């Protein structure tokens, strides 16, 4: 493995529990916020060392509202990760975005409640979040064939799916995708000055958009399973397009602000 101090991170979503073949090592991490969802596996993709963490645990132990998001992001940064891809499953609120589509959102709407979504409970630290995703990492994915560039992802609390009225409300507000894990993952990355981009795989058309019985968990997992190898190939291809040196300044915004503690 390379040891260039420029490790990338990948946080796998539902059904995305492994990423590498052989030649890996596993790191058991502990953080001020507890342990992450699973041990972190480190392998190599092209010229990059990559740290992989399954968001929901190795066996999907954590539902979306219960994922230890703060521990996950802290553990990755403590390993030296500064750039993170977050593949995830999403429902479509746009009839033109059909199951199997891969979308790289550029905006986010938070409709969660009660999640631990900051490291800075004390001190005057306020994350710049107007553009929640790293433009440099987004470009690494949107430059790939067949990927949809842009869209607004609304993040709901879960673990239940949306009602028809909620889906129609989200769509009328201009949201294109609905998901359960994109927040607080994105804002915690920003607080830790990590570059972060979501890679959203559409698994279903949401209840308020399509006729029928609505979204069922079994159908979501089945659709993700059918497309998981495609998604992994896209993530690997995106990693190959990431520069060796981190050049993005968009996600580094704490300069001149006294932090209540040192970042790992």
From Swiss-Prot:
Binding site for substrate: 180, 204-206
pH dependence: Optimum pH is 7-7.5.
A GO CC term assigned to this protein in UniProt: cytosol
Transmembrane regions listed in the UniProt entry: none
Pfam families named in the record: PNP_UDP_1
Highest taxon in the source lineage: Bacteria
Pathway annotation from the record: Amino-acid biosynthesis; L-methionine biosynthesis via salvage pathway; S-methyl-5-thio-alpha-D-ribose 1-phosphate from S-methyl-5'-thioadenosine (phosphorylase route): step 1/1
Regulation: Not inhibited by adenosine, potently inhibited by MT-DADMe-immucillin A.
UniProt xrefs under Gene3D superfamilies: Nucleoside phosphorylase domain
Residues carrying the site annotation Important for substrate specificity: 162, 217
MF terms in GO: S-methyl-5-thioadenosine phosphorylase activity
Enzyme class, broadest EC rank: transferase
Record's subunit section: Homodimer.
Family: Belongs to the PNP/MTAP phosphorylase family. MTAP subfamily.
Name the record gives this protein: S-methyl-5'-thioadenosine phosphorylase
Organism for this UniProt entry: Mycobacterium tuberculosis (strain ATCC 25618 / H37Rv)
């Amino acid at each position: 493995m390379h040891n260039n101090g420029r490790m990338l991170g990948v946080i796998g979503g539902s059904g995305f529990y492994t990423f590498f073949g052989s030649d890996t090592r596993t790191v058991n991490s502990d953080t001020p916020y507890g342990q992450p969802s699973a041990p972190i596996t480190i392998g190599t993709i092209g010229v990059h060392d990559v740290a992989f963490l399954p968001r929901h645990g190795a066996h999907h132990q954590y539902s979306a509202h219960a994922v230890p998001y703060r521990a996950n992001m802290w553990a990755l940064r403590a390993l030296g990760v500064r750039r993170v891809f977050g593949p995830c499953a999403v429902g479509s609120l746009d009839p033109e975005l059909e199951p199997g589509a891969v979308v790289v959102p550029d905006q986010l709407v938070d409709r969660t409640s009660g999640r631990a979504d900051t490291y800075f409970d004390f001190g005057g630290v306020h994350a710049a979040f107007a553009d929640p995703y790293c433009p440099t990492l987004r470009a690494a994915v949107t430059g790939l064939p067949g990927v949809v560039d842009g869209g607004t992802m609304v993040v709901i609390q879960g673990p239940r799916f949306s009602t028809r009225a909620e889906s129609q409300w989200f769509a009328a507000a201009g949201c294109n995708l609905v998901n359960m894990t994109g927040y607080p993952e994105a804002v915690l990355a920003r607080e830790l000055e990590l570059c972060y981009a979501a890679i959203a795989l559409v698994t279903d058309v949401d209840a308020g958009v399509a006729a029928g019985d609505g979204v069922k968990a079994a159908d979501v997992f089945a659709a993700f399973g059918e497309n998981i190898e495609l998604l992994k190939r896209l993530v690997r291809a995106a990693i190959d397009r990431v520069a060796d040196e981190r050049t993005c300044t968009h996600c580094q915004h704490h300069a001149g602000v006294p932090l209540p503690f040192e970042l790992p």
